[in-house]
Amino acid sequence: MKNIFIFLFLFINSAIFAQTTFQVSFPNEKGLLDGRLLLLLSKNNKAEPRFQVLDGHDTQLVFGLTIDNWPSAKPQIMTTGNTFGYPIEALKNIPAGDYYVQVLLHKYETFNRKDGKTVKLPMDRGEGQQWNLAPGNIYSKPVKISINPKSAQTFKVSLDQTIPPIEEPKDTKYIKHIKIQSKLLTEFWGRPMYLGAHILLPEGFEEKKDVKYPLAIFHGHFPGDFDGFRTTPPDENLPNDYNSR
């Protein structure tokens, strides 16, 4: 009986300590960090893991951890106990094998709202709330690793890359871009807030200053510019490409 208890003790302890953990550092950051730390694992290198988290069956793995006022000089340890994943819920349940690992911090900002509440949210930076493209987010370069759930492993990951700002679209003869600060939104969110628009102008707009035109408004989903417009006709010899539907 004593031997059975010893065996169970050793078995349970080996299961507890045989964990895969990730030690994440922030070498280029200063001060405190807020945001969602995302651990990304992919079985292939067709693209960076941050671009392979999808809604379909072929999605790769992601595990999240919210950090709040985290000292940037202190590494963050990601384990099965403090992360939540998709489509695999627990980090400990990752099958053994080779993976490409990448970690990204989707940064949050503090808003002191007019209603008296203080919230931390990911401010849109022109990318349309796409965490894997948001300027200012920091991430690591993909690295190939081998995971063995039966052994204790710690992988060190350095978030030394930064997503650059999005280049503003340029005005043309027919397409203009405006950005207006909203008084109501600025007052509510406690910081300058803007509304933007891409404007398609009619022929002769610059010459006919006294002419009034009808206005058609289309609310897209964060388009980077006005699409579907060109000043040259398409090639007459292009073959027809019919949709199967």
Walk through the language-model features, giving the residues of each.
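Bacterial Sec-dependent N-terminal signal peptides
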Residues: M1-F22
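Short, surface-exposed loop and linker segments with low hydrophobicity and enrichment for Pro/Ser/Thr
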Residues: I16-Q19, E29, K92-A96
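Contiguous beta-strand segments within globular domains
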Residues: Q19-F26, K30-L37, M193-H198, I217
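Non-catalytic cap/lid and distal C-terminal segments of serine-dependent acyl enzymes
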Residues: K43-F84, E89-R245
